[in-house]
């Protein structure tokens, strides 16, 4: 089992706000994520966290100048509005005729209101976390659990030197006598030497190969594909049966609103397009070969965008900064039998026009959503209103994934800032929901806006709904390569004056996450 590993960086305060321009009124709490499972990150963004590279931050909503509310849209239920149809039709006309709309060259939803929104840059090298790189390399395999999933072990009680096996961690719990009890997670109590000998006995001799009496084992990718095809077949049969028994209603069909997909067309019917747009999905962590092949080109687009739209100096747009901000990711590449074929994790979507990258959408594909991280484009194509256009295309992509992964049904647009005029367009995607900053429950945006018109910071949930309390006993930490509950860690480091910091981390990360993620302690 893989575990997320994070370092809590506490509160960062007094930095510049990217929305109102105030130099010192932005506040947030942060974590450095060495690695995150996609489920843990899903749980974090459902508590108001977002990532920028490997830096994960949570705005301090009641203190900051421009409160940032997590916003999501239920993609399968999307109702396309007139203004959004206009954006798609304008793009189709351009692809068909090649003509740019007159007088609209400067009108654009730029990167500050593009789906992902404005992010703080990851901490500089002076602020980087303290976890040694050799520790990270030893724990990439994650925590292994014993049978039944219990994090327990027996035997040695000395913390020093217990986890010298690469890719494996001990998981310790308090014994009845107050010490550490447990065996190496995932073993049955034998000594390492005994286990090694037993494993060697099971290894077939060279040259013998697989058992010819048994069929060859199928690869997990093939098994996932077969299960997905079976689900699609069953769904098609169900829809066919429903169609046979459903009474025809031609007038209703004619009057029913068009779906999003019906507005996304490559060219006006009956005309040959002047331009061809292709959207490519490219995994960035671990970097795929296609990402490596296109890294320089996509970085050049980013450089043009940042200098033109945000007036950033060229040295702040260097390849190193670009990768730290939009390529580096803590998300672990994961696959599931009932998930999308592309898997979960971090990706780029390249908008390729006539073989040339004109825009890039940075997205995370998570168990229940597609999360927009950032979007940038070549300013030459700003007339296409690419902020709204990209959001609609990412919504269409979410709807496509939902066909084979029913639990993946939401599109997260980053943050909604009611005080920022350029952000208002996010609320136009219906149905959309804002996250209550106190109860962490999503509420329909139409119920929230009247409250925000009165107060920029507002609770949306009813008073009888509250966030679950978290105790320090529930917090898992990583110390000396060993995962253990926080009270056990305190037995070994009673002098550590970090209790208030860990309490704050637990409250910010929430009950579900602190029992799954490992908080690094040096």
Where are these regions (language model features)?
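Eukaryote-specific detector of the first structured module of a protein
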Residues: 18, 34-37, 46-47, 51
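Intrinsically disordered, low-structural-confidence terminal and linker regions
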Residues: 1-19
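Intrinsically disordered, low-complexity N-terminal segments that are enriched in acidic
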Residues: 15, 27, 39-43, 64-73
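Terminal, non-catalytic protein-protein interaction segments that mediate quaternary/complex assembly
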Residues: 11, 23-26, 35-36, 53, ...
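Aromatic (often tryptophan-rich) hydrophobic motifs at membrane interfaces
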Residues: 349-433
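A conserved beta-strand-loop-helix scaffold within acyl/acetyltransferase catalytic domains
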Residues: 4, 52-66, 71-78, 84-383, ...
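C-terminal catalytic domain of photolyase/cryptochrome flavoproteins
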Residues: 349, 404-522
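A residue-level signal for conserved active-site and pocket-lining positions in enzyme catalytic cores
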Residues: 44, 302, 426
